[in-house]
Amino acid sequence: MFKKIDKNANRVKRHLRIRKNLTGTSEKPRLCVFKSNTNIYAQLIDDVNHNTLVAASTLDKDFSGESKSNKEAAKLVGELIGKKAIDKGIEQCVFDRSGYLYHGKVKELAEGARSAGLKF
């Protein structure tokens, strides 16, 4: 009998494997991505002090896209977090894709953040 593959459980395992080697500091925080079926979220996290420096999502008041779950929305969230980070004086970060493949929405968010001026 075949077992059903749980994609989210596999993603969490990948995320834990990746997180062993990724840490963010206040000078170079970790850009963490989370996507649900309806929204996409991004945070710049300082792992040394355990706090979130900047956050952006499709639920923000500053978000201006019509749809909240497609690639265009992900690119807008990337640009939004990039602008907020530059305003706070953060220019570099470490990209944490949270176990998701670097494809589609995750890739668009990363490109949006790069176009706003973040370097990673």
From Swiss-Prot:
Keywords: Ribonucleoprotein, Ribosomal protein, RNA-binding, rRNA-binding. One of its GO terms (molecular function) is 5S rRNA binding. It holds the Pfam family Ribosomal_L18p. InterPro entries: Ribosomal_uL18_bac-type, Ribosomal_uL18_bac/euk. Gene3D superfamilies: 3.30.420.100. One of its GO terms (cellular component) is cytosolic large ribosomal subunit. GO terms for biological process: translation. SUPFAM superfamilies: Translational machinery components. Belongs to the universal ribosomal protein uL18 family. This is one of the proteins that bind and probably mediate the attachment of the 5S RNA into the large ribosomal subunit, where it forms part of the central protuberance. Part of the 50S ribosomal subunit; part of the 5S rRNA/L5/L18/L25 subcomplex. Contacts the 5S and 23S rRNAs. HAMAP family: Ribosomal_uL18_B (MF_01337_B). This is Large ribosomal subunit protein uL18.
